[in-house]
């Protein structure tokens, strides 16, 4: 089976990352999804988390199915790029990717980069897509045409992926990327994959036995592509990344395909009977093949199998020329350059890369569209609030005027002698139906608790940010320039601004609460009177004498005006509801604008849409205000006439004052209750917003803590690696110096070492057994830690034995006094003539001779070495048996 030595880029590796919590939190904070959509989004987040684990953390087979998983994950990342922002400030998720080419070392781990950025994740996944494409292409068997076509296609797609990544990587990775993601590295990989794609096309042509003219162009272009790849791979910035085999194979294939191009051109020359040029090109081909042997391994049989054909063709052509043609061999330098044909090109990358891709987050709109929709909602809310406030202020103004005129209570006084006017009965009943003064007091009592709850959330949020900043400042102060991550001030600016914004909102709300409280105190007496039962309310109002006038035309006219005013207030309530409930789906307009221009002119689109759907409502509001203006003038004119008619009335000034106060209190109650309910709703609505802000800050602090721990771990590893490397270097230097010192002493020791003693003479056979040694001495010797008994005779015979104890068979190794030696001992061979061991080293604790041995001199003492040197302060000695 022919092999072609195709190269494939390695995959980047990463760690497991939990996407569920941060993505769910971000979606809840940003998007107001319905209950049905919320369940769909939660399911999509879970599916995305599983997809990442499968695509990035599990082993990938060199198969199209594994590539489909990677491309699907990448397409999903692109789809949510504008929907779910992942950044260090908005939605921090730490992605850690290791360098694909760095294998690490004994003292350091693989180079890696950790960033809280979704674009960094996309860049790493895109690199792995290009790498896996190259691996699948290189793994083809090249037995069939389909396999060759698949290989050429995948190599071109891989080249396109690396080329695209080269152009955009610096914009996707905000910090300096790892070496595998540097533009020069990606350019070299793209050039290499393009060369291999052209080579696959050459293999297809060679298999199909294409014409020599075509093979010349294809092979010459293969050599050209490999030459470009070799130049890019030889740059200083990327030269250290590649394995030695890579550089050798690329250089070898550059030469080999130059040789093949010359060989195929020689075939063309042979067909044209250009023997001189044919011989020159064949000789150059052989020369190039000989040079390629220095780089290209012999196991790449797909190329080396052609080499015998070149050699054979050269021999045949030379023979024919020598015997038949006798043409002069052309000078190769004068020959024209070979034509080239570019058949392989990097395939432009298209998204989505997965056929029939389906976005799991289709219910979410891009953040730009979402922001535009929020701006539209803000404009719409501003319009609704403005029109509502205009109507409410006008209503309050009208009610104030009527209360100052004591209308409609004054009309009841002229037609009835009842102390409590009918209009006040209705107002009191309505006020008590709404809860009366107790309801107002209850709402007031809840506001401080609601305010304090939101204030506590903001305080805790600020505390989390401050603690994170203090921790970062402490580490930066301790480690200085080694602490390379971004400072907290650079990242927390938007969060601090948001906290300040909500503090300002709370302060404004607190001031509004005080104003409402003051207004309540000014109308408290009237509200409390209206909250009493009818008899108590009647007793608090001064009575009146018989009325002076009856149902006059002026009274009837005023009653008609009051009825018209009631109709106006009823219409305004309906108008307020219509303003609040008017909605439209403007998302399609924004999506269309974004698809056409990649930009959204939100102001123009929003204003045009608002004018379209709110134009008629605004006209009705203005008509209501105009009607009120006319009606107010008519009421004031009629009231002047009415006041003149009732001049002789017996109604006292105190009664009129009380009736006016109660009328104003009734109107104030409605406003106060609405204000307090609105304030309660405001605080309750603000709480989840602040909780989401607190969660966002907590996620940011957690991500920063994870980043901090990872950076500290890397710093510790670098410190430990540096210490370990220093220790190894010091150890090697120590060994080298000790070896040199020992070698010098060993060279001097033979002159000072004692001569080797003669071998022992065998003892004469004896009928009687030798006298055993004393039992006392044996018992002492049997105790490992016991010192030998004092023997002056032995000390005289062996004064040097006390220098140090040595292990038998091992030299230059002093042993500690009185300790057993667990080393190997010579095997005991018993004899009938020696019931006790009588050879040196039999008792390892102490090297002594028995008295009979000393007398007979049958055994020599243990060899002593370096004694003179030791006594003279010299170094270690050499082995005396050398």
Curated annotation (Swiss-Prot):
Region described as Disordered: 743-882
Ranges of biased composition (kind: Pro residues): 752-763
GO cellular component: basolateral plasma membrane; cytoplasmic vesicle; endosome; multivesicular body; organelle; recycling endosome
GO process annotations (BP): endocytic recycling; endosome organization; mitotic cytokinesis; protein localization to organelle; regulation of protein catabolic process
Gene Ontology molecular functions: Notch binding
Record's compositionally biased regions (Gly residues): 872-882
One Pfam short name: BRO1
Low complexity composition-biased segments: 791-830, 847-871
Chain ranges of the BRO1 domain: 5-398
Function: Required for lin-12 degradation after it has been internalised in the vulval precursor cells.
Name of this chain's protein: Apoptosis-linked gene 2-interacting protein X 1
């Amino acid at each position: 089976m022919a092999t072609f030595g195709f190269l494939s880029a390695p995959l980047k590796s990463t760690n497991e990352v939990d996407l569920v919590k941060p993505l769910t939190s971000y979606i809840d904070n940003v998007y107001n999804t319905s209950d049905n959509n919320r369940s769909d989004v939660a399911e999509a987040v879970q599916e995305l988390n599983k997809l990442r684990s499968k695509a990035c953390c599990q082993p990938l087979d060199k198969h199209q199915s594994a590539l489909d998983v990677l491309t699907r994950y990448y397409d999903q990342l692109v789809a949510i790029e504008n929907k779910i922002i992942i950044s260090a400030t908005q939605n921090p998720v730490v992605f850690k990717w290791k360098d694909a080419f760095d294998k690490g070392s004994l003292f350091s781990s693989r180079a890696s980069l950790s960033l809280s950025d979704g674009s960094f994740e996309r860049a790493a996944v895109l690199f792995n897509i290009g790498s896996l494409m190259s691996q699948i292409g290189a793994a083809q068997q090249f037995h069939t045409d389909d396999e060759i076509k698949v290989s050429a296609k995948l190599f071109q797609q891989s080249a396109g992926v690396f080329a695209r990544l080269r152009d955009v990587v610096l914009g996707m990775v905000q910090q300096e990327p790892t070496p595998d993601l540097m533009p020069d590295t990606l350019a070299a990989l793209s050039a290499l994959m393009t060369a291999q794609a052209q080579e696959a096309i050459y293999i297809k042509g060679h298999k199909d036995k294409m014409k020599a003219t075509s093979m010349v162009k294809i092979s010459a272009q293969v050599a050209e592509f490999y030459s470009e790849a070799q130049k890019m791979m030889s740059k200083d910035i990327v030269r250290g990344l590649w394995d030695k085999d890579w550089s050798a194979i690329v250089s070898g294939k550059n030469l080999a395909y130059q040789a093949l191009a010359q060989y195929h051109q020689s075939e063309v020359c042979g067909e044209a009977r250009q023997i001189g040029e044919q011989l020159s090109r064949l000789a150059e081909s052989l020369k190039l093949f000989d040079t390629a042997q220095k780089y290209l391994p012999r196991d790449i049989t797909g190329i080396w199998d052609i080499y015998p054909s070149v050699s054979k063709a050269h021999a045949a052509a030379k023979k024919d020329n020598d015997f038949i043609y006798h043409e002069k061999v052309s000078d190769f330098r004068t020959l024209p350059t070979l034509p080239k044909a570019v058949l392989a090109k990097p395939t432009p990358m298209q998204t989505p890369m997965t056929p029939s891709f389906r976005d799991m987050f289709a219910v979410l709109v891009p953040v730009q569209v979402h922001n535009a929709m929020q701006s539209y909602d803000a404009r719409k809310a501003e319009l609704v609030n403005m029109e509502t406030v205009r109507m409410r202020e006008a209503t309050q103004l009208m009610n104030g005027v009527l209360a100052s005129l004591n209308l409609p209570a004054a009309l009841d006084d002229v037609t009835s002698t009842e102390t409590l006017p009918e209009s006040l009965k209705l107002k009191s009943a309505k006020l008590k139906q709404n809860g009366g003064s107790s309801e107002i007091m209850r709402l007031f009592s809840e506001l401080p608790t609601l305010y304090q709850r939101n204030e506590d959330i903001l305080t805790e949020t600020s505390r989390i940010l401050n603690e994170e900043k203090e921790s970062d400042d402490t580490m930066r102060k301790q480690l200085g320039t080694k602490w390379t991550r971004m400072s907290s001030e650079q990242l927390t600016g938007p969060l601090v601004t948001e906290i300040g914004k909500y503090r300002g909102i709370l302060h404004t709300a607190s001031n509004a609460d005080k104003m409402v409280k003051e207004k309540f105190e000014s109308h408290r007496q009237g509200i409390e009177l209206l909250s009493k039962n009818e008899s108590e309310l009647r007793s608090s109002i001064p009575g009146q004498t018989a009325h002076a006038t009856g149902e006059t035309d002026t009274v009837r006219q005023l009653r008609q005006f009051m009825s018209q005013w009631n109709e106006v207030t009823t219409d305004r309530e309906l108008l307020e509801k219509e303003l609040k409930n008017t909605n439209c789906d403007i998302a399609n307009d924004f999506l269309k604008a974004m698809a056409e221009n990649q930009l959204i002119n939100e102001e123009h689109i929003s204003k045009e849409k608002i004018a379209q759907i709110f134009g008629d409502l605004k006209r009705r509001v203005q008509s209501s205000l105009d009607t009120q203006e006319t009606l107010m003038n008519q009421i004031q004119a009629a009231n002047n006439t009415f006041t003149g008619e009732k001049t002789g009335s017996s109604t006292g000034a105190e009664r009129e004052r009380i009736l006016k106060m109660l009328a104003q209190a009734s109107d104030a109650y409605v406003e106060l209750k609405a204000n307090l309910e609105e304030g309660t709703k405001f605080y309750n609505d603000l709480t989840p917003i602040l909780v989401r802000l607190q969660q966002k800050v907590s996620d940011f602090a957690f991500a920063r803590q994870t980043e901090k721990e990872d950076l500290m771990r890397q710093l510790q590893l670098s410190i430990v690696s540096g210490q370990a490397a220093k220790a190894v270097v010091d150890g090697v230097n120590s060994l080298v110096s000790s070896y040199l010192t020992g070698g010098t002493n060993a060279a001097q020791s033979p002159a000072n070492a004692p001569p080797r003693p003669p071998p022992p003479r065998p003892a004469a056979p004896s009928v009687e057994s030798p006298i055993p040694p004393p039992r006392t001495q044996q018992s002492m010797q049997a105790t490992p830690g016991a010192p030998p008994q004092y023997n002056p005779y032995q000390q005289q015979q062996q004064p040097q034995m006390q220098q140090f104890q040595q292990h038998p068979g091992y030299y230059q190794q002093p042993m500690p006094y009185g300790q057993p030696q667990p080393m190997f001992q010579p095997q005991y061979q018993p004899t009938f003539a020696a019931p006790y061991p009588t050879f040196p080293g039999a008792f390892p604790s102490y090297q002594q001779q028995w008295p009979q041995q000393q007398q007979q001199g049958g055994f020599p003492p243990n060899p002593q070495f370096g004694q003179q040197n030791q006594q003279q302060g010299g170094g270690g000695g050499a082995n005396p048996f050398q």
